[in-house]
Amino acid sequence: MKTSNFTLLILLFFQVFRLTAQEKDILIGGEQLKYRIHLGFINAAEANIRSSSNLGSIRQIPTRKIEIEGKTLGIFNVFSPLLDVWVSHIDPSTLLPVKAEMNKREGRYRKQEVVDFYHDKGIAQISSPQNSPKDKNLAISNSMLDLISGYYFLRKKNLQDLEIGQKMSAKILVDGQVYEIWCVVKGFEKVESKFGTKNCIRTSLVLPKNNLFQDKDAIRLWISQDNYQIPFKMEVNLKIGFLSIDLEDYKIAGKTIYTALP
């Protein structure tokens, strides 16, 4: 499996953990979020999240389509072009994925994959023209998440009920492999942004030992402390440099939710 640093960062940003607190109805139709990914003042990439306005249906299961797109910008798009697209069709009643699609274009590398989740049977059917064999079945738990559904499990919970030091974890299926991610609640802080000062919940993400991140507290994620509970800001201390991800725009059904300061 080939997973770029950018792909891993997007994975971490939008799939963090499953929580145990009061649940919320958060799978909103017509939602659009845009993020800026930058090294200091240099824009490196952007990421967009879009949810369909209307429900669809797969195998007679009602679903809402969610799409995440990440792409490089400027000089990064010249020397290391990347366009990654993830799509998830989620059951609104359970927030479990019914079908997930991935399309990676990273330099000369290409990867397409489709995963059909059968939670009642404990099976994920994975199909990719780049895999050998092309089709395979993978045994999964009946609550296995994909990249995008994990993001909504996070937003579904009342994060303000959490205590500092509380730890959580989850397993997700991405690119044919299961990842486990841990999260530690670090505190409640005010974050300065283009939208003014925002109350946020700060967390730290912990991964198994790897050669990408500088230290155990290298990934810091701030989640908005409001009814929307969206990833508001992220800072990553890589061995190759310091990277930031900031919210640029947030709309629901075309209506601006956070207004930028003049």
Which sequence ranges carry the predicted segments?
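Bacterial Sec-dependent N-terminal signal peptides
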Residues: M1-K24
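Alpha-helical structural elements
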Residues: L9-L12, G30, D146-I148
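Acidic, serine/threonine-rich low-complexity disordered tracts
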Residues: Q22-H119, N158-P262
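Hydrophobic, well-structured mid-protein blocks that either form specific transmembrane helices
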Residues: E113-R155
